[in-house]
Amino acid sequence: MTTKRSLKALGVMLIFAAMIAVGMLNSPTQVRANGEGSDDGEKARIHRGLAIAPVHLNLHNKDRDLVGLGSYLVNGAMDCNGCHSSGPANEYIVPTGNPYFLSPPFTGKQQINPATYLGGGRDFGPFPGDPFPSIPHLYSRNLTPDHTGRPSGGLTFDQFRNIFRNGTDFDHVHPMCTAGPGDPDNCLVAPFNGDLLQVMPWPVYQNLTDHDLQAIYEYLKAVPCNPGPDIEGAPYLQNTCE
């Protein structure tokens, strides 16, 4: 009897242990390990980000993994340079110069102009030919690091995060108009809010994690300083590199 009871107890213990093992194998932790949020997934994004960076990166005193992830987000997912550049930002290697003209089909290869990369200056302001523009010139900002080594005119990370979370315009470039359009210069008419960035899609980007924002910030610290375009009425685009 004692032997039978011992064997029965042992069998119950083995079944219980097997149930625990199956549960662990099918736990959310294991599912995450096979998903995009896994360490392997992030390593792949870091590797791809470092591979597609279009300019030389200064990795001295930088977190290499954060820089790689930031490059993946800036260059591979968000196309920040598409807005934060002036002049010929991208030159697609196809005979037509346009990746949407299939001659031949676009293969993903492009050349980035380092002279304009993330230097700002693209105008999202009045429509051409509008005799009574209701909005001023809205230039994309210079995102590259200044002489402090911090991006976008020396922003701290807290300021940088605030921009993504709340759309805050720390430059206060566009005050609210007090006496109609254009008074004062560069003013925004109601219902636009002069304290907010008007073009940047921060209402979407505010959903990025702090880790993602830290990666973007670290990447922007690693790109070369761009002195920015010389545009009349937009001195805030100028960057002091040294």
Features from the language model and the residues they span:
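Electron-transfer interface patches adjacent to heme c in soluble/periplasmic c-type cytochromes
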Residues: M78, P99-R165, D169-V173, W202-L213
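Sequence/structural segment immediately N-terminal to covalent heme-attachment motifs in c-type
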Residues: D63-P88, I93-S103
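Detector for the c-type heme attachment site
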Residues: C83-A89, R165, P201, K221-A222
